[in-house]
Amino acid sequence: MKNFTPFVVMLVSLEFISLSQSFATLVGDTTKIWVGTWTTAPQLVEPGNMPPSPGLTNNSLRQVLEVSIGGDTLRVRFSNEFSTSTVTMNSVQIAVSTGGSTIDTSTNRELKFNGNSQVTMSAGTAVTSDPIAFNLTPRMDVAITIYYGQTSSSVTGHPGSRTTSYIIAGNTTTTTDFTGAVTTDHWYNISAIDVLAPSTTACVAILGNSIADGRGSTTNGQNRWPDIFSEALLRDSSTQHIGVLNQGIGGNCVLFGGLGPTGVSRYDRDIVNQNGVRWAIIFEGVNDIGGVSSSTAATNTANNLINAYKQFITKAHAKNIRIYGATITPFKGNGYYNQYSELCRNTVNQWIRTAGNYDGCIDFDKIMRNPLDTASLVTTYQNDGLHPDTAGYRKMGSSIDLNLFTALDTTTLGVHSVRIIDSYVLGQNYPNPFNPATTISFSVPTQSFVSLKIYDALGRVVSILVSKLLSAGTYSRQWDAKGLASGVYFYRLLAGSFIETKKLVLLR
C-alpha cells in the first residue's frame, strides 16, 4: 500500500482543486458591489415642462444621458414617485448613443423587470430593472428608449435635463433614429443607473439646486460643474474609480418651498441611500437665502440652514460617508440680492468654512467671487448674476481638490477622530491551513444584514457563522471544524449588494 499512497493523495488533491474551481464559479470568486454611475433627482413635473404632444401614452420616448464610471453589468431605476396613477412601460431598451436621437443598434439591449418586458409602476413607487451585461465605458452617452402603455396625467421626471429627448408615435424602441420625433429638453421617469464594480469603486453624491443642475450650461454639452468634476476624477489614476451623482434640482430649497421636494425631505433618497456613496457634497441654500428681506429673517434662515446641515452631517456619518460643504456663491446683480440676504450668505459660509463642522470645505465662493466686489461673481464667469456661465462651471468643477476623495482611514466628526470603514472587506482566515479551528474577520461600512456561511467543495452549507443585522464595524468569527474531513472549504460573505467568497483548507 505504501507505493500507492502518493498517487491516491494526488488524485484527492486534484479532485479538491476541480471541485474548488467549480464551486468558486458557482458562488462568484470576485468582489463586486453596486455603485451609482448616473442619477437625476425625481420631482413632480410642472405644467410648463410636461411631455409635448403626442404625449407618452402608447408612444416611444428616447432619452440620452452621460454616465460617469463604466462597468460590464448595469441596472436602471425608474420613478413614478410623484404621479397620482399607474404608469406602464411595455418595453424598455438601452443602447449606446451615437449623437442626437441615433443609437448603435448592435448594442441595443432590452431591460427586463423580474424577467418580464412589461412593468407597471404604481403611483408613488419606483422600480429597478434586472441586471444586464452591457459594456459601459466611462462618460459614455447612452440612450434609454421606453415604449409606454398607459401613463399618468401627473408626471414624475426631471425638467432640468440640459439634454434633448425624443417622442414619436407607436413602438419604435429598436429604431436606429427617431426621424420626425418631437423634441423636449426634459427627462421623464428615468432616475438612476448602477454598475456592478469592484469593491474599491465608489461615488460622490451632490445635493444641489440649479447651479448643480446646470442652468446656463450648454444643452447636450454635458458641461455642468459636476460633469467637469467627473472628468477630473477620471483623468487621475488615484480617483478614476469614483463616480459622480448629480442630484441638483433647479429652484430647490433646503428648508421649505421652492421646486421639487426640499433638500431635507429628499436627502435620504438622493444622497445616503444611493448605492456606493462614500462622499457627499452639499451645495444648496441659495434659494432659501434669496427670500430673506430683514435682519431677523437673515438670522433665522442662517440658523435653520445650519441646523439642516448638521442633520445632513449626522446622517452621513451614520453611513460612514464623508461629507463636504460647498460655500454659497455670490449673487449681487440678481433679484435675490439685498443687504440682508448677503448677511445671511456670509453667516452660512462662515459656518461651512469652520473646521469641525463638515469634514471639509469646497470654497466655491472664494474662487467665483469678484475680488473688487465680493458680493458679485467674477464678470467673466457669470450668466445672470446668480448662475455661472460655461466658463464659470468649468472653473468650479476643475477647482475641487481631488485629495478629498482619495482613500483615507480617518475623518473628523466634530472634535473626535474616528476610524472610518470605507467598504465591505472579507479577510483571509487565520491560520490557514488550520486544524481544527480558524478565525474569519470581516468589515461592514454601514448597517447591513450579514450572512457568513461555510461550504464544502460540493457547495453544501456546513456551518452558518452569521445570519443577522449588524451595525457598521469590524467583526471576527471562529469556526471549529471538529468532526469534518480534511479538504478545501469555502466561506462566503453576503452583505447588502456585496458578495465575496474565499477558500480555506482543513488539514488534519
Over which residues does each language-model region extend?
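N-terminal secretory targeting modules
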Residues: 22-207, 217-220, 238
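Oxyanion-hole/transition-state-stabilizing segment in secreted/luminal serine hydrolases
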Residues: 38, 213, 217, 249-304
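Alpha-helical scaffolding within the catalytic cores
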Residues: 60, 188, 226-233, 259-275, ...
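Bacterial N-terminal signal peptides
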Residues: 8-18
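Catalytic His-Asp segment of secreted/periplasmic serine-dependent ester chemistry enzymes
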Residues: 290, 328-416
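Structural recognition of the beta-strand scaffold that forms the well-ordered cores
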Residues: 75, 203-208, 212, 242-248, ...
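C-terminal outer-membrane/trafficking sorting elements
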Residues: 418-430, 434-508
